[in-house]
Swiss-Prot record:
Pfam families registered for this protein in UniProt: Ribosomal_L3
Keywords, in A-Z order: Ribonucleoprotein, Ribosomal protein, RNA-binding, rRNA-binding
SUPFAM superfamilies tied to this protein: Translation proteins
GO biological process terms held by the UniProt record: translation
InterPro entries: L3_arc_euk, Ribosomal_L3_dom_3_arc_sf, Ribosomal_uL3, Ribosomal_uL3_arc, Ribosomal_uL3_CS, Transl_B-barrel_sf
Assembly and oligomerization: Part of the 50S ribosomal subunit. Forms a cluster with proteins L14 and L24e.
The protein, known as: Large ribosomal subunit protein uL3
Family: Belongs to the universal ribosomal protein uL3 family.
GO CC terms: cytosolic large ribosomal subunit
GO MF: rRNA binding; structural constituent of ribosome
């Protein structure tokens, strides 16, 4: 007879509840603690443009293909620079074990940038006393646990066809002392941050995004339940479960129809193959399908990433890297060829 496999569903219970994400901009709940010897932002964001394939020299010394060219599928993520509009300091409330904002400082935003961020924050004041706010924060650093910059995306510099930016907080890390983090964040106020200021080619990152939405789906597509034979004893349907159990208590483990897709998901330890400021070198003939032209810088991420094109994807330093991974000894891979074949097949 052999082993009888009991598989009531193919969907993992680790992803419950399977409901729609609260926001299309992914929220990052945890950040790693890293030591680089210099301060840096712990994350970055970009817009998914599409996928291409490249040839890259395998640099894994334990691989049987070491030193040989491999064909890999990669995701092109357009990364227009972030504009830092402020910083915020947080302290830990010992009674509730939660972060509490103790102060913030905003920069006087120039008019060419203000007209865009006003779409997201209509009540933004005209002027800020940045020096006074920074001086007040300087006196509170003894009680501060985290320093985060307030950054806005610049989609009007990308090919996504939108002008309203997203405003998000990105913590500062890389050094253990708050004084160094505060000094670094203060120096970023009113400046642009590029992906090369945060990451470097060859390193691993965690990719956080909202997956492609598929609406309401049945148990066959949603959980991979085995379809029943179509004969007279299954007159109540074949694309359904045989039984949901006795009433009135139906177990939450029972596969049911419902929302599929548009979930916030994290993919760990994706490798950055390339970072460049020249988007024209990666744009296929005729542009990316449903996206267009990469107008600013871009990153090549090995493999696939969650979400559809034009969707915002967040990157952070790896929170659970391999045991033999050293951030200080990252080597850039050798990308020898990139496919820029257009949709029509014309290269």
């Amino acid at each position: 007879m052999g082993l009888k496999i009991h598989r009531p569903r193919r969907g993992s219970m680790a992803y419950y509840p399977r409901k729609r994400a609260s926001d299309i901009v992914p929220r990052i709940r945890n950040w790693p603690v890293i030591d680089l010897g210099k301060p840096t932002l712990l994350g970055f964001v970009g817009y998914k443009a599409g996928m291409v394939h490249v040839t890259v020299v395998d640099d894994r010394k334990t691989s049987p293909f070491f030193g040989k060219e491999l064909v890999k599928a990669v995701t092109v993520v357009e990364t227009p620079p972030l504009y830092v509009v402020g910083l915020r300091a947080y302290a830990i409330n010992p009674l509730k074990a939660e972060l509490v904002s103790v102060g913030e400082a905003w920069v006087n935003i120039p008019n060419e940038v203000r007209k865009y961020i006003a779409r997201r924050i209509p009540t933004l004041p005209e002027k800020f006393d940045t020096d006074k706010a920074l001086a007040d924060l300087q006196g509170l650093l003894d009680s501060v646990s985290y320093i985060k910059v307030i950054a806005m995306t610049q989609p009007y510099k990308a090919g996504v066809g939108k002008k309203t930016p997203e405003v998000l907080e990105i913590p500062v890390g890389g050094v253990p002392t708050i004084d160094e983090q505060f000094k670094y964040a203060s120096g970023l106020l009113g400046k642009e941050v590029k992906p090369t200021d945060v990451f470097k080619p060859g390193q691993l990152v965690d990719v956080i995004g909202v997956t492609k939405g598929k609406g309401t789906q049945g148990v066959i597509k949603r959980f991979g339940v085995k379809e029943l034979p179509r004969w007279h004893k299954h007159r109540k349907g074949s694309r359904r479960t045989g039984t949901v159990g006795p009433k009135p208590a139906v177990m939450y483990t029972q596969p049911r129809m419902g929302q599929m897709g548009f979930h916030r998901r994290t993919e760990y330890n994706k490798r950055i193959l390339k970072i460049s400021d020249n988007g024209s070198e990666i744009t296929p003939k005729g542009g990316f399908k449903h996206y267009g032209i990469v107008r600013s810088g871009y990153m090549l991420i090995e493999g696939s990433t969650p979400g559809v094109v034009k969707r915002l994807i967040a990157f952070r330093y790896p929170i659970r890297p391999p045991f033999n991974y050293d951030l200080k000894q990252v080597q850039a891979p050798s990308v020898t060829w990139v496919s820029v074949m257009g949709v029509s097949g014309v290269s």
